[in-house]
Amino acid sequence: MKRLLLLPITLLLCIVSLCAQQVDTVTIHSKMGHDLKNVVILPKSYAEGNTRYPVVYLLHGCGGNYASWITIKPELPQLASQYNLIIVCPDGLINSWYWNSPLNKDMQFEDYISDEVIRYTDSHYRTIADRSARAISGLSMGGHGAMWNAIRHRNVFGAVGSIR
């Protein structure tokens, strides 16, 4: 009887483990000297094979943080699986506007988003490392940051969206 129960319990633990790995929080040490957290959402199919995936970068609004998107849109993991893509939600602090400050070297968020986060994601995950497979979007301040970064880094992002 114990052996009969062991198999279903083992299978259940494997399934739970795979689901738990779908949403990661990673920390990137930026050139600004900040340790910044990012949510990375992988499609369920990521665990299978060697497929490379397109990436959507979602920037949060003013007053938010890296976890804002997963909080306001908890179905993001299902959407990542439905559309077979990776979603990355970087931290832009509460008011960076995702651009480089000419006065404060600790606020170089354009470089962080368009260079550091991209390089980290492409080197740690199986991405399609090409502008044609990268999109950036955001809400409010994040929408501004998405438009700003996409226009200034056309070689990095192939699609852009802005919400509100």
Where do the PLM segments sit?
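Bacterial Sec-dependent N-terminal signal peptides
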Residues: 1-23
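Non-catalytic cap/lid and distal C-terminal segments of serine-dependent acyl enzymes
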Residues: 20-164
